[in-house]
């Protein structure tokens, strides 16, 4: 029998280039931060994980890592227990300990699954219950964006996207390159009527494409209610139009268009009030902050029981995260919508062989045991050096936006 007790846990912060994408919080910084987690067993098997790379996450992982030595990689309850002890011991330094707990567990748990899969010759999708779909469909994630970051001399390859016409160009490029079928617009940047004009331009250009829009809570309930006649029948779901469960319940009560969320139902404690108030009918899961792959499968089961739709949230990520997302989605029977991914926006990669390739907008589950991906150590070293050089330790889209628009002010809701 393989010795699957944990011998070492290594956490390496990295930074990779990110375009100047716009959202309600501001503008993406030139570098996105991630952490690469390696869980090594006593037999020398190394499992991989990828998660957030901001200072609070890195500090917590640094405390948790040595406490995991001797724990078997199958002992997920032990992981939760030891992570909770860290949260309790360090609680005076955490403003939202429960949210950090699920992020700490989510970071390490994936690497434990990968290590166990590699040790036993089984794919993670099989360990999660078995593959239920041959391919996993993803959506084109459309953003308004500046031509280049503040201080850069020339535009990036995407160029400026601030009009409906340029949104159509952006969507066409993603469809041509990756074959995506569904289109998602990140909104909450401009006046709602302007963003809905962008949706109409997309509908005209791509009449068969399912559309969705995500204002990130930027609209008031009153604004959202006024906009519903334009959105009903146009979008497959409306994601986080306004703030909170109660505010969105007001909206859902008067529309057949399902509301979706990745902002206001992000913990198991949010599910009962959401279900009771019928606020969101689609949940966007994310193993990075729900507590890992098992917790995300548990969430999927709850959604199935209560008749909630299920999709998958994304943030700026690289290939280890994308592989984990693909395994999870392939093992989730009730995945009812195409998943989100930021992958087309990233040019760097940390796995051998380069970026995973979309075919007709979908990914196949990587072959091989565990997650089926291998860490590219030269890329890891280069991206770690980026982290050391870039000077960014937290995500601050608002500060980045003010470099472009000094008078810009954050608001949620804003319109």
Please tell me what each predicted stretch does:
Residues 129, 134-252:
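Metal-dependent enolase-superfamily TIM-barrel catalytic cores that perform enediolate-based chemistry
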Residues 40-120, 406-415:
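Metal- or metallocofactor-binding catalytic centers and their adjacent structured scaffolds
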Residues 47, 136-140, 181-185, 211-215, ...:
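Hydrophobic faces of well-ordered beta-strands that scaffold small-molecule active sites
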Residues 59, 230, 243-260, 265-374:
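Shared catalytic-loop signature of beta/alpha-barrel
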Residues 371-415:
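Extended hydrophobic packing segments that form well-structured cores
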Residues 6, 44, 108, 121, ...:
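Conserved, mostly hydrophobic/aromatic
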Residues 1-48, 52, 342-350, 398, ...:
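Structured beta-strand/loop patches that form or line metal/cofactor-binding pockets in enzymes
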């Amino acid at each position: 029998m393989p010795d699957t007790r944990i011998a070492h846990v290594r956490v390496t912060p990295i930074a990779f280039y990110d375009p100047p994408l716009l959202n309600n919080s501001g503008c993406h910084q030139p570098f996105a931060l991630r952490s690469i987690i390696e869980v090594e067993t006593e037999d020398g098997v190394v499992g991989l994980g990828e998660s957030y790379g901001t200072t609070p996450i890195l500090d917590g992982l640094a405390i948790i890592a040595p406490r995991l030595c001797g724990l078997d990689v199958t002992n997920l309850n032990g992981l939760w227990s030891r992570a909770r002890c860290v949260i309790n011991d360090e609680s005076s330094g955490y403003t939202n300990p429960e949210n950090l707990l699920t992020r700490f567990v989510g970071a390490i748990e994936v690497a434990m699954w990968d290590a166990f899969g590699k040790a036993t010759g089984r794919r993670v999708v099989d360990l999660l219950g078995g593959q239920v779909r041959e391919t996993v469909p993803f959506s084109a994630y459309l953003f308004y964006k500046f031509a280049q970051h503040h201080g850069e001399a020339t535009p990036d390859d995407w160029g400026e996207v601030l009009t409906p016409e340029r949104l159509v160009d952006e969507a066409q490029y993603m469809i041509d390159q990756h074959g995506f079928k569904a289109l998602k617009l990140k909104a909450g940047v401009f006046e709602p009527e302007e963003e809905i004009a962008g949706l109409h331009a997309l509908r005209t250009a791509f009449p068969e494409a399912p559309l969705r829009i995500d204002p990130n809570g930027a609209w008031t309930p009153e604004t959202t209610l006024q906009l519903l006649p334009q959105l009903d029948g146009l979008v497959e779901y409306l994601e986080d139009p306004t703030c909170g469960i109660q505010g969105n319940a007001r909206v859902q009560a008067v529309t057949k268009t399902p509301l979706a969320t990745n902002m206001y139902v992000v913990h198991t404690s949010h599910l009962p009030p959401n279900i009771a108030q019928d606020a969101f009918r689609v949940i966007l899961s994310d193993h990075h902050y729900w507590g890992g792959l098992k917790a995300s499968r548990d969430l999927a089961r709850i959604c199935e029981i209560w008749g909630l739709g299920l999709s998958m949230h994304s943030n700026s990520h690289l290939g280890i995260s994308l592989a984990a997302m693909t395994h999870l989605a392939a093992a989730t029977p009730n995945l009812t919508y195409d998943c989100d991914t930021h992958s087309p926006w990233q040019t760097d990669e940390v796995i051998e062989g380069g970026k995973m390739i979309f075919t007709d907008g979908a990914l196949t589950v990587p072959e091989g045991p565990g997650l089926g991906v291998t860490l590219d150590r030269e890329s890891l070293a280069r991206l770690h050096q980026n982290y050391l050089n870039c000077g960014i330790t937290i995500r601050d889209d608002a500060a980045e936006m003010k470099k472009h628009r000094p008078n810009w002010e954050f608001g949620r809701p804003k319109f």
